UniProtKB/Swiss-Prot annotation:
NCBIfam families with a match to the protein in the record: L17
Annotated family: Belongs to the bacterial ribosomal protein bL17 family.
Name of the protein in question: Large ribosomal subunit protein bL17
Molecular functions per Gene Ontology: structural constituent of ribosome
GO cellular component, one term: cytosolic large ribosomal subunit
UniProt entry keywords in alphabetical sequence: Ribonucleoprotein, Ribosomal protein
Gene3D superfamilies tied to this protein: Ribosomal protein L17
InterPro entries: Ribosomal_bL17, Ribosomal_bL17_CS, Ribosomal_bL17_sf
Coiled-coil ranges (or none): none
Amino acid sequence: MRHRKSGRQLNRNSSHRQAMFRNMAGSLVRHEIIKTTVAKAKELRRVVEPLITLAKSDSVANRRLAFARTRDAEVVGKLFTELGPRYQERPGGYTRILKCGLRAGDKAPMAYIELVGRPEAAQAVDVEAAE
């Protein structure tokens, strides 16, 4: 039975799921908005929000924790130099999910997940090809 087990399986084993969310978190930090399915967007919130909270206090230990979770030095740099200071006064809720219809191929519900307060110049990036 799966009583009280949190998180979605998304028809993947744990290593595939971990790698997928690591890649998606990196894409979201880099581009500040990505398009994905609603279920993946809701799960991605649980990965990205703690990373941004970690980036609010810049220390070597926190940078190492962020690197352990993302495995990307560029993403860690952006987290601690741009996103941490940007959300210093916000006590959580750094992402927004906007539903955007159904995917043409399989009618899966799609959504944009974006960082709140992002600069408007950032354009949406479709990460479905990467999956």
